[in-house]
Amino acid sequence: MTHYILAIDQGTTSSRAILFDEKGSRVGQSQQEFPQIFPDDGWVEHDPEDIWSSTLAVCRSVLKDTGIDAQAIATIGITNQRETTILWDIDTGKPVYNAIVWQDRRTSGFCQSLSDQGLSEKVQEKTGLLIDPYFSATKIRWILDNVDGARETAQSGRLAFGTVDSFLLWRLTNGKSHKTDATNAARTMAFNIHTQEWDDELIELLGIGDVLFPEVMDCSADFGVIDASWLGAEIPVNGIAGDQQAALVGQACFTPGMVKSTYGTGCFMILNTGDKAIRSEHKLLTTVGYRLNGKVTYALEGSIFVAGAAIQWLRDGLKLFADAKETQSLAKQALNDDSVYLVPAFTGLGAPYWDPDARGAMIGLTRDTSVADIVSAGLRSVCYQTKDLVGAMAQDGATFSSLRVDGGMVINDVMVQFLSDLLEITVERPCVTETTALGAAFLAGLQVGLYQSLDEIEVLWKADKCFEPTMEKGTGDKLYQGWQKAVDRVRTRD
């Protein structure tokens, strides 16, 4: 009998459900986009009910489309957009405010005040993170301070906090399970990555001590059982990881020194550092790669806020094309893309700049600039930002000769080839590019015995195509210098 794993991949712009067999082969998939809410400059929100309804819809859809009975699903794995913050009343199950998305910059002033108080060192030492609006803790504080009744609900012991995984788990189990995993907890700025516990000192300093925090589990664990009313059967949830850490597992980067980069709404490069929590001196993040059987594997991460979101903006905002698939053919038509730069700092700049007040710019436009040139500049902006991260990792002592890539953008051969040319290394694209969902499936499968070890998972990884550098030496460096000048023009801080 075939054992199936249902992977829920709740992302920034869409929710997906992917059904895998135990060999890691995709059996079926369903995806549904949901609205983005932009109430103010630099603010990004989601309606938690949209997150919930779209997730439930795709789970039901993939079962219907494949004809597979819910009884045949051995386990569920959840992976999710990280840092996005939801607070809900445990009595009603209803959120008290919209989900504040990881891209949201509304708390930049509060973050600056924390830095001015001299807390940067303490925060980085305990959490591995920099003080930034990106992370969950200051979003919690904003809701408590600005939403009528939120602090009173918290003080009465009824206000639960969760990242998206925790919120979905609560809903799926009808409020029986308030849990998260170590990778999601590590992105809140309230979790001590060394003790692997919520940090009471930071929580009190941030003024969020009245909120109910979820129990932190290994990435493979018994998180709870979903109510039969949702999919027609009681199914255990046995794997949870934030999307980028799930991709690290899906890419089988289990050996220290292995690195992957995921290209979705944003871009996230993660380097496995083994049992050592390496502190970056160049504005990278020290984080949890995964935690299994109580043992933590640490990672060094560079986070870019806008990657695929730049292409989405070119499509939906500027209406330069109707479908993202058109970008490959358009990029091939570009004639002036060497001189056109798009800096997609729509919600500030992430690593290694960490400038929340920077804003986007398009530089080098002339009367000859075409749609193809602008589209190519959008694709290249993702590669230039990746090189920013590679440079920061190199300064922290990391060396690597290859990079594993995944996510929706990497089906674009033109972009991936330019990435290889720019970095001057081999870039490997796996057969399964949606490795985020695959990683969640692997983690769930580990817990229920479908896989006995990470070694067993590693042999399932297969490369679809390896891209080797073809650009004339020195050309990439010249192009990158142009990028650095463009970035300097939008930065507001050193």
From Swiss-Prot:
SUPFAM superfamilies xref list: Actin-like ATPase domain (SSF53067)
GO cellular component term, pick one: cytosol
Modes of activity regulation: Inhibited by fructose 1,6-bisphosphate (FBP).
Signal peptide: none
Pathway the protein contributes to: Polyol metabolism; glycerol degradation via glycerol kinase pathway; sn-glycerol 3-phosphate from glycerol: step 1/1
Residues annotated to bind glycerol: 82-83, 134, 243-244
Keyword Kinase: yes
Binding locations of ADP: 12, 16, 265, 308, 408, 412
Binding site for ATP: 12-14, 265, 308, 312, 408
Protein family according to the UniProt entry: Belongs to the FGGY kinase family.
Physiological role: Key enzyme in the regulation of glycerol uptake and metabolism. Catalyzes the phosphorylation of glycerol to yield sn-glycerol 3-phosphate.
Protein name: Glycerol kinase
Gene source species: Marinomonas sp. (strain MWYL1)
Record lineage: Bacteria, Pseudomonadati, Pseudomonadota, Gammaproteobacteria, Oceanospirillales
